[in-house]
Amino acid sequence: EINDDPDAQQAIKDEGKRLEKQGTWDINTVREYDNLVKDTKAKGEKVHVARIFPICSEKGSELKKGHPERKLKGRCVLEGSDVRDENKDSAIFNELSSSPAGLEVSKAVDCYGSIKGHSIEQCDAEQAYVQAKLGGTPTWVRLPKELRPESWAKYKDPVCLLKLALYGHPDAGGYWEAHCNKHL
């Protein structure tokens, strides 16, 4: 469907530009995958390699066409179910799982807010995970063709370094939680 919808393609490109501008991946580190693996093994180091894939959804699809709150939302997500190391084996992670607040916490906050003289607020962090730096084993990514710079046309299998905790990375939630705790 995305291939047949120019608006969906544009939504994905817009999201990719936002993520690149934020420094999520570094296009200046581009190199051939085979060279990355060869150099990494020669140095006795570890790397992880994954694919980023685009998705697109329609927000406000229940609204009439043309409504200002009905729009396409592009997302770029790391395929966390298939991250490989320099030997093409499944990658092993630090298991930095995040601990989202449970239902009990939510109810306690609601209760506090219902007490006379008290109030509560909530908000959603804009592009939350990619506010956090990605740690651990360096992760290199294959960008989808629509997000690759023209200068990459000479590469057979280009990869670049992932710098921020992109959605889909198995440890992204843990890095986001650590980032959030540091700033609270």
Please report, for each region that a protein language model flagged, where it lies by residue:
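Nucleic-acid-interacting cores, centered on viral/eukaryotic replication and modification enzymes
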Residues: E1-L184
